[in-house]
Swiss-Prot record:
Pathway info: Amino-sugar metabolism; 1,6-anhydro-N-acetylmuramate degradation; Cell wall biogenesis; peptidoglycan recycling
Protein name listed in UniProt: Anhydro-N-acetylmuramic acid kinase
NCBIfam families named among the record's database cross-references: PRK09585.2-2, PRK09585.3-2
Highest taxon in the source lineage: Bacteria
Keyword check for Transferase: yes
Catalyzed reaction equations: 1,6-anhydro-N-acetyl-beta-muramate + ATP + H2O = N-acetyl-D-muramate 6-phosphate + ADP + H(+)
Binding, ATP: G9, T10, S11, V12, D13, G14, I15, D16
Alphabetic keyword roster: ATP-binding, Carbohydrate metabolism, Kinase, Nucleotide-binding, Transferase
Family of this protein: Belongs to the anhydro-N-acetylmuramic acid kinase family.
HAMAP family the record matches: AnhMurNAc_kinase
Amino acid sequence: MLVIGLMSGTSVDGIDTALVEISGTVESPQVQLLAGETYPYSPRLRETILQVCGGEKLSIEALASLDDNIAAEFAQAALNIQKEAPKAQLIGSHGQTVFHRPPANDRLGYTVQLGRGAAIAKITRIPTISNFRAADIAQAGHGAPLVPKIDAYLLSHPTKTRCVQNIGGIGNLTYLPPRQRENWQQKIFGWDTGPGNVLIDLAVQFLSQGQQTYDHNGQWSAQGQPCSELVHKWLQEPYFQQYPPKSTGRELFSPAYLAQLREDAQAYCLSDADWLASLTDLTAISIAHSYQTFLPEMPAEVLLCGGGARNAYLRQRLLAHLGSNVKLLTTDEVGLNSDFKEAIAFALLAYWRWHNFPGNLPQVTGAKAAVLLGEIYR
């Protein structure tokens, strides 16, 4: 079955689009990437999305218009990826997250992904599955992360313990015990580790007065020295101490949050590069701390994906904090494209929904039950 996966994450870089061929059975899928492309948002739309993610208020009418505009660009991405390929039979669209509230006490969580599937299906004339997180949240789960089940099927190893570490705007991990271990699927864990690129990107935009949107390959940060005392202070953030299941987003790690980190740094007389190096170290240490604090064992291998996988300085700092016994790779090195891994994941989640196969792992999200994820629009 030919399926398109569409994904735009918390970095709001653009629409990651993957055309994949899925064969085999739902419980033993074979996935081949036929084409992958990231289509940038139009500048005005990206700016509006970032403003909304930052807490800017919209009228209901403006929100509806934003939803339609995002859906139109997602639909165009799906049409573009097929121009030199066979027509897809199904689309799985994550949409654009603009708000995420984890569950608390007796209150269900809440999440908003814009770019409605009904509009994508109408424009493309291809059945579209979207709103993947809602069913898990209705079962008292976080609705995130949803990728661990895909990681289990595509990236687990017979004898090695692995972690898959996505470093997008937010970092999230999947812990994969060896497949030969008894009841290994019940022992899979996953959660959001904290900031991935989000604070680094916001800082680069601030320091460059909007001329740069990210630290290319970590070159700016690599010119500085992280301030250990300052990073230790930042690590007192309660989220880092919270036990899984847990999820987070730009609602916490926001421009206002970065402004506080900037204020904290004033007492240390840091250069711009030192501050960026410290923010990069915060991401690296928060990931390593998550592993060392919450995992039953350290992995033999960590497989990186997402934009942060291309940041050489971040990789260097992460390896330093994880320790020499951990091998750091990208998912490319084990056969899964790291740039389009999330888009591939939502193609497979759509395929599972189409075939009535549950897509969540309750022990990961905190949901009461495994459920079908996504709503089908024809």
